[in-house]
Amino acid sequence: MGETVMKMLAINPISLKKRMTEFLFDYLFILAYLVLLFLGSMLIYIIFFNGVPEFTEIQSQWLVFLTSILPITLLFTFLDYKNDGSFGKVKAGLELVYQKKTVQASLIRNTIKFLPWQIGHIGTIHGFYSEFDVLSISLSISATLLAVLLLAMTMFRNDKRHLGDLLAHTQVQLKGD
């Protein structure tokens, strides 16, 4: 099956309102997942462990990665690849276009997109175990700066592409453009 090569727009007409709509719906979806994850985890902890068990820092890092970051990254990778966009993109009338549509491109894009979240978790979890030493604070600041950079790129670049889009050769466009 031959893949269609899509054109990247040098001047992308997506409005800030459409991007904020996309971000809001994706945020609400992720928040709902995290609330269900919390409730399910607490239920399991209460039923099987008589309360929340003690975890080492490494166990906490893996638990957070495997239950929140990895599933969300893989789900958004799937949605971007299969449906040309996340729930937020669909709701906002946007779609993800690829220079060459591959699962790898979608995974690269979403890994970069959720990297600030993962770095933030690493810093915060390390902070709980280290009384917020220089490393944990540095990681938390780095996560925030990277998130701001990615958001600023989607808002202020003429092509509206963030670092993940540049590396994956993708672009969010108005649906049907």
Model regions: which residues?
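Membrane-interfacial and juxtamembrane segments of integral membrane proteins
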Residues: M1-D177
